[in-house]
A protein has these predicted regions:
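Acidic, low-complexity intrinsically disordered segments
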Residues: 1-176, 180-184
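Conserved SAM/AdoMet-binding glycine-rich loop
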Residues: 169, 173-238
């Protein structure tokens, strides 16, 4: 069960949602965001949840520690968490002990080294009827994780990666086609750190996208300076 737009919910709504969903089979509550999840309502809900369900793990995740500062976490996963989550739930995970400034202790799991999930070839998300996806919505899609550049201002963990770290083109094609057939989705936000970090990636995915029975609208972060010198990339993006 994934709850989006949580910052728009009231504390009472989050509590009611929890009462409806949490049962004896619930293993954990996950809190995660691309950027900060440090807002008052979520703090209040997380502490309420831990008081109500002390035996259920609260697992947080982000690329940066400070994004989860102060939350009552049992585990904090640093990096992409798919493989690390399996290790946590199996009870066989490597971790180090840490403490927030407010005194709360938690276990940090380093998914940037011990449980690397940056080179997964299947990055698809499968939505369900209860997600209520509307045709005009903008969904997120991943081409790959990490970046080949090593910019000095960047704090991204997976940078300066020189090999092909992107997903398979068939996997991307199948995800986009599934979303179109089920929900009528044509609009996407590409979550890659740099969409046009290397030409081969753009060419592969452009080939897959051109096979689709529709033309998707996609937006993502690109380096414009690279396009000036790479006419082939312009053609692939268009």
């Amino acid at each position: 069960e994934v709850l989006d737009f949580v910052q728009s919910w009231t504390l009472e709504e989050l509590q009611e949602f929890s009462r409806q969903r949490v049962n004896k089979n619930t293993k954990f509550l996950g809190l995660s965001a691309t950027f900060s999840i440090r807002f008052k309502t979520l703090y209040e809900f997380a502490y309420w949840f831990k008081k109500e369900h002390p035996d259920i793990l609260i697992i947080g995740g982000s690329q940066a520690f400070h994004n989860c500062e102060g939350l009552p976490l049992d585990y904090m996963v640093h990096g992409y968490g798919e493989i690390a989550m399996s290790a946590i739930l199996s009870g066989d995970v490597k971790y180090t002990e840490h403490k927030w400034l407010n005194g709360h202790s938690f276990r940090r799991v380093d998914a940037t080294h011990n449980y690397m999930a940056a080179r997964m070839k299947d990055l698809s998300t499968h939505y369900e009827e209860r997600d209520y996806i509307e045709p005009q919505e903008v969904l997120t899609v991943e081409f790959g994780r990490g970046c080949i550049f090593n910019c000095h201002f960047c704090t991204l963990t997976y940078r300066n990666i020189k090999d092909d770290h992107s997903r398979s083109e068939d996997n991307l094609y199948e995800e986009l086609l599934e979303n179109y057939n089920k929900w009528g989705t044509t609009n996407y936000s590409i979550s890659d750190e740099t969409v046009n970090d290397y030409t081969e990636k753009i060419e592969r995915f452009a080939g897959s996208i051109k096979k689709l029975p529709f033309k998707p609208n996609m937006a993502g972060y690109i380096r414009g300076d690279l396009l000036v010198h790479k006419q082939k990339d312009w053609q692939a993006i268009e």
